[in-house]
Amino acid sequence: MDQKSDSFLSVSSISFSYSSSTDKDFDLICMISPIVLLYITLLSIIFFVAALIHLLVKFLHRPQTRLDDAYDGITESSTALQGRYQTRFNLHDAEIDQSFIDALPLLHYKTMIGLRHDLSDCAVCLREFTAEDELRLLPKCSHAFHVECIDTWLLTNSTCPLCRDNLLLLGLTGTASSSTIVLVHESDGDNSQDSDSSFMLTDLDDVESK
């Protein structure tokens, strides 16, 4: 009977000892886990912030050569295009000296009847020419207009009202030339009305030298 009691006490002591050690281990694990979790969380946040700062610094210090070259190219192209448009605008709206306008050749419409079928009305006032009308002829394009119409037009414009040829681009700027411009009538045949005829501008000095 005594032996059984001793055995029971021994088993109970062992069980109590094991249970006590298990409870201590569990309590230790419960105490360590929150600390480890906190450290892991802090390290993750630190690594994330460091990576974000690294990317930001790399982005801010990236080479600007390509972007600067592209911007410079766009700026130069825009400036050149603006300059060309400004030049054309200035030429179109430039005023012509009155002395140059007065030097442009004059003719009477009756001398042109039957010779130029495209010359029937004034492109400025849109009125048809009559035999008594005095016209002024523009060089190069050979378009003619009423004297008062084209003179008023050229005071504020430097282009032909009909074809938009620019008189300034033709080198006809400033004051009138010292030589006199005359209208020469060229005919390929006899004096018949059906023969091909044309008009040209020439310098009176060249005519006299011939």
UniProtKB/Swiss-Prot annotation:
Superkingdom classification of source: Eukaryota
InterPro entries recorded: Znf_RING, Znf_RING/FYVE/PHD
MF terms in GO: transferase activity; zinc ion binding
Region annotated Disordered, chain positions: 187-210
Residues spanning the membrane: 35-55
This enzyme's EC code(s): 2.3.2.27
First-level EC class: transferase
Keywords, comma-separated and alphabetical: Membrane, Metal-binding, Transferase, Transmembrane, Transmembrane helix, Ubl conjugation pathway, Zinc, Zinc-finger
One GO biological process term: protein ubiquitination
Pfam families documented for this protein: zf-RING_2
Chemical reaction(s) catalysed: S-ubiquitinyl-[E2 ubiquitin-conjugating enzyme]-L-cysteine + [acceptor protein]-L-lysine = [E2 ubiquitin-conjugating enzyme]-L-cysteine + N(6)-ubiquitinyl-[acceptor protein]-L-lysine
One CC-aspect GO term: membrane
Membrane topology, as annotated: Single-pass membrane protein
Zinc fingers (RING-type), renumbered ranges: 122-164
Signal peptide: none
Zinc-finger listed as a keyword: yes
SUPFAM superfamilies: RING/U-box (SSF57850)
Pathway in which the depicted protein is active: Protein modification; protein ubiquitination
Similarity annotation: Belongs to the RING-type zinc finger family. ATL subfamily.
Domain comment as written in the entry: The RING-type zinc finger domain mediates binding to an E2 ubiquitin-conjugating enzyme.
Protein name per the record: Putative RING-H2 finger protein ATL50
Organism of derivation: Arabidopsis thaliana
Gene coding for it: ATL50
